């Protein structure tokens, strides 16, 4: 039997695809151009006619054919460059067949044919007649190729949560005390005392203490202090100390860097030269990198102290030859009345840097960060605020974290009056009068023994020192507590520094990303797998689905029946444990199929399950139409902002951006839902997965364990981390950034030059402590009053004509000028705004925040079914009153509502022992408990009488325990008002005056003295980076512009009903931005 043979034939042609003009083409060309040219000549009978020997040159151009007779010149010469666009076409006449040349990858080829093609809109594949789409190709084309949609989603960068174990850290914990100075901008707060203490690396601490002494700070009780009421002295000295400390730390790093890398040049070496040396491998890769971190810490310093001192501490380091070897970058962010970031990095090239590899990614899953992971080494200077990490006052933080030191008390008003006018009201021992203290207990507790003099200033110094010591203890407790949490709860093998990030929100977000990266088997890169951030057009679409919470009363007035307050336990934490969108979004084709299938289910008669595996997670545009009026309830499922105000309404919802959870909730509540399948923007995912459940479960378990062990520190940490996670996903971004002109990056500069960005405002940060030269001295030689000449006055002769132009002397007023010795760019802050209409986002998975709020609305919907399910078909006016006030996560229930909760809703009470975390059992996981509990026996207590004036403005008269009969104090909520001047009787009198009288006889108001912070953008009434006191008076009155319709009147109040088709919203709806009949009108015109 003969062996089989295989004949291999080489292909004579190849092809490439592209588009020429507006059409797609497939270009087939000959691989062997010599044979192709010979065939071309034979086809035109050139060789047989003239019997010439054909010599094919390397480059085939029209010059090759110049030896041909004139009457046989080829007709057409054309070429297509790179297969995308026609390059040239020459009509030369003649009798030969057209010749097409292709220039491809630097070579010339003879084209056999150009075949027109079609392109699939779903996957981008080009074909002649037909083809079969591939799911993965469709998704890749939608996410990475198609220009209209490839910018909709961005990968989220990941970095391990750990801190460098070899970094040397120095903490500067400080506090200031201020008094009121009457400036041109009002009552400006000026520091008169600064106290600080150094903690951390012993070598850095000794150097810092030496610099503090050199700058004029005095040691006192293991701290350093400066007492001076002059406006700029303390700020100037504190700035000098910080700058000198940065310079010495940088000099120390640089001296060792030179030794390790044998840099012998005595002249200045620039950072660019060091980078070039690193690229040429002239730096030693085995030298251990060094890192120094200087952390300025205080309590509420980003919202007060750093702003008061801003004109000094915001001045950057001088970029002179002394520091030219460092790359100095600054991260500066004033936001929401706080200086969130003011970090400075002084970087040197890290020769030990290694590109991440497979083993690196596996190490990152444990949170371990090492020096070889960073491209730089050097000094990092940070400003951190313990308020942003504890969300409480210093006194409450001391209790929450079980600190042994106490904060003390200080009569601020007496000190303020003393520094303003030099005296204050006091007794014979100089002890401040009672009006300066907040209570009688505080007044008596701090009063010295008879005959002992009270030193007000010394007490202020001691009080400030105590504050600093409490903050020092808090810093230690936070460092050790979070390290323990990272080791024992998160099970990570890394060093953790809680002050590496500025807020609790950024800390918990980093922890979530770390745990998510650790749990994903496909996590082998610098980005989070299967979790993306919406950007540009998609970011705006997703943000429209992030709706605010519910907050309004169902009753306005004085309610005299017993009622209780029920609260959902950890609502956002429970919502985070439910399934979320997972993976990339589907292509338009697959999305259309999924939306159509979901619409079919929505059109069905049966209720839908939130956890139906055949329903994909999606955020789409939809219209929703309510059922008949008697089938509605007083807790609407959704809110709308079409009228300009957020209204929870039972009116039709048109063009709203909704999640899958919202759509199922509306369907189950009897609403008719229509998905807009031809909407411009949509997001459909293929899979549900509880992304945050593991992290939330860990925090809840840690909190319960800390409760059992009475570990208040771990309880506070786990509770804060759990509650702050939702807020990190819901962070709203914008197109603005505030930068110093001297620190503007090359990227920002190029965007400004190209017109992609523009400077919308400029702010100067000038300090009187800068070196300056004043010309007011010359004023004494100008603007002198003109005195009549005494000799002329004695003579009768008329004075001679004055020998200068003009009839008035000193008609120009001399104005002195002050010259500052500083670079302009060091004093200018620019607000740079992108000219793009869309916001770029590569940090936050905003769709998670949208679904968290949707799950929380599903909780409230299920709660509404428990309370109002039996009222379906009954008019509003005939229903029993079951709730009088509602907030995002709470309801004030009447006796009837309480009865329903302990009967029909017993399984949703926390005492039932059910889980707060979703367990894949097809049921929503949420529990409630009674917030008004008895302080003695912990039983559910009720309020006998309450007054509701407006959202977040109400008062409970008392709380009465039905078990033990204890009557305790009530509850007051008055957002935006000074609670000190509001009582239950005041709110009750206010409502009755407005309710019973046509014109109230008395005007009710609250007064307080808030602090107004001005950051980068100043005005005529406020200077940049100043803190001033403002007297604010607010009128107390019933809900002035309610977003609900008035219902049934009661004896001391009335009910409020949601808007519906019978009681429509009186506000105008969203106006049309264009004529909807534009096309028709243009045709008839």
From Swiss-Prot:
Major enzyme class: transferase
UniProt entry keywords in alphabetical sequence: DNA replication, DNA-binding, DNA-directed DNA polymerase, Host nucleus, Nucleotidyltransferase, Transferase, Viral DNA replication
PROSITE patterns xref list: DNA_POLYMERASE_B (PS00116)
BP terms from Gene Ontology: DNA-templated DNA replication; viral DNA genome replication
Chloroplast keyword on record: no
S-S bonds: none
UniProt subcellular location: Host nucleus
GO MF annotations in UniProt: 3'-5' exonuclease activity; DNA binding; DNA-directed DNA polymerase activity; nucleotide binding
GO cellular component: host cell nucleus
Catalytic activities: DNA(n) + a 2'-deoxyribonucleoside 5'-triphosphate = DNA(n+1) + diphosphate
Annotated segments matching region Disordered: 1059-1085
Alphabetical list of Pfam families matching this protein: DNA_pol_B_2 (PF03175)
Family matches, as Gene3D superfamilies: Palm domain of DNA polymerase
Main location: host cell
Coiled-coil residue spans: none
Taxonomic superkingdom: Viruses
EC number, UniProt record: 2.7.7.7
Other facts: This DNA polymerase requires a protein as a primer.
Quaternary data: Heterodimer with the terminal protein; this heterodimer binds to bp 9 to 18 of the genome. Forms a complex with viral pTP, DBP and hosts NFIA and POU2F1/OCT1 for initiation of replication.
Similarity field: Belongs to the DNA polymerase type-B family.
Function of the molecule: Eukaryotic-type DNA polymerase involved in viral genomic replication. DNA synthesis is protein primed, and acts in a strand displacement replication. Eukaryotic-type DNA polymerase involved in viral genomic replication. DNA synthesis is protein primed, and acts in a strand displacement replication. Assembles in complex with viral pTP, DBP, host NFIA and host POU2F1/OCT1 on viral origin of replication. The polymerase covalently transfers dCMP onto pTP, thereby initiating complementary strand synthesis.
Protein name per the record: DNA polymerase
Gene name tied to this protein: POL
